[in-house]
Each structure stands twice: as C-alpha cells, then as structure tokens.
Design a protein with these regions (language model features):
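Hydrophobic/aromatic-rich alpha-helical bundle segments in the mid-to-C-terminal region
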Residues: 115-120, 130-196
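An amphipathic alpha-helix adjacent to DNA-recognition modules
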Residues: 15-20, 32-33, 52-76
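Hydrophobic alpha-helical connector segments
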Residues: 70-103
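Solvent-exposed, amphipathic alpha-helical segments
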Residues: 21, 25-28, 104, 108, ...
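Short alpha-helix boundary/capping elements
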Residues: 58, 94-95, 110-114, 126, ...
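Key DNA-contact positions within bacterial/archaeal DNA-binding proteins
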Residues: 48
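Amphipathic alpha-helical segments used for helix-helix packing
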Residues: 65, 93-124
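Basic, helix-initiating cap at the start of DNA-binding domains
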Residues: 1-45, 58-59
C-alpha cells in the first residue's frame, strides 16, 4: 500500500490534524493504549471535538489505517499489473518518518477491538476492490494475497530477515511477484509485462 509521511501543513483542517495525530499515535502505541483524549491533546482540541469528527475510537482507527494505506491507489490503475504493483509496494524501502499501514497493524495485533476494525478494512478496502477488478479471483485468494504481503512486510521491516534484505533485489522482486500471481491464479498470459 502506498506510503505515508506525516507532517504538519498550515492548510490542514482540524479534522485532518486529528487524523494525522491518530496515525502517529496508532503507529507508536497499541489500539488499547491509545485514547481519544491523547489524540485530542496532541492536536490541542477537546475530546468531544474528536468524537464529533469521527464518531468513535474504532472509526478513527479505521480512518487512520485507511489513510496510511491508501488502498484506493492500489487498485485504481490495475490493468493486469496488480502483482507488480503490490510487489513494488511491499518491497519498497521505508523512508525516514514514513508510516506504513503495517506500522499501525503491528502495534495492535493483540487487541480484539482493533482486530475487528482491521478485518473490516481488509474486507472493504483490499479484498472487495481486488475481487471487483478480478472477478474470477475468490475472496479467499484475495485474503491470502493480503496475508502473504503482511508476512513479507513483517519479515522485511520488523524482523529484518537477511534473505529479504540482502542479495539480488531483482530476483526477490520476481519471486514475490510470481507468488502473488500464483495465489491469484494469474497465468503468464494474464500479466502485463510492461508492468515490470
């Protein structure tokens, strides 16, 4: 999923400032250890304003995950390039101060409330758009692609697994692309070679 660098902007609305503060909080603290009061204090607004703007902590968490992942960009210009798009995204180097969706997800794995929100995000913002673009792909396989990407991302960015960080980057990229294509059951004729 596209990467997100969080930085203040003088043109940000209060709602946008709240969302940026939430992304920062949720990427550094678990869902259960992050309160609306903390986020409100980070922005300098009343907690009631945060609630009016987003409705609940769960809805704010969902918006933070969605904004950090920008899933709509993944499926906007697919045209047979989805395995390449997903591969480039998961293998791209993380820039300083960059927050990725996995940074938020990893902080809140153990929270049942966060898991419900993450499941909703997976369904609505990854599985459904993928299946809409590729109607022959079962929902189960779309979810398996997400699982594979999460695993690669965790091993690469969190565990720092040497086989994913050292060696032939082009070979790794091709391996990941082919695994995604295999999960989706896309044959060589289904892939646009101009995506490479």
């Amino acid at each position: 999923m596209p990467n997100r660098v969080i930085s203040p902007d003088a043109n940000d609305t209060t709602r946008e400032r709240i969302l940026k503060a939430a992304i920062l909080r949720f990427s550094a603290h678990s869902y259960d250890n992050t309160g609306l009061r903390d986020i409100a204090a980070d922005v300098g607004v009343d907690m009631a304003y945060v609630q009016r703007s987003f409705g609940s902590k769960e809805k704010l968490f969902y918006e933070a995950v969605k904004e950090s992942g920008k899933p709509e960009q993944l499926f906007a210009d697919d045209d047979g390039c989805l395995p390449s798009i997903l591969t480039k995204q998961i293998l791209s180097r993380k820039a300083a101060n960059e927050i990725r969706v996995l940074d938020i997800v990893i902080q809140s794995f153990a929270s049942p409330a966060a898991s419900r929100v993450l499941n909703e995000f997976l369904e609505e913002d990854f599985v459904t758009p993928l299946v809409s673009k590729h109607p022959m792909v079962p929902r189960r396989r779309a979810a398996l692609v997400a699982a594979f990407l999460a695993g690669v991302g965790i091993l690469k960015d969190v565990i720092k697994a040497d086989p994913l960080l050292k060696g032939d980057a082009a070979a790794l990229e091709e391996d990941v692309r082919m695994v995604i294509a295999a999960i989706l059951e896309l044959g060589p004729n289904d892939l646009d070679t101009s995506c490479d």
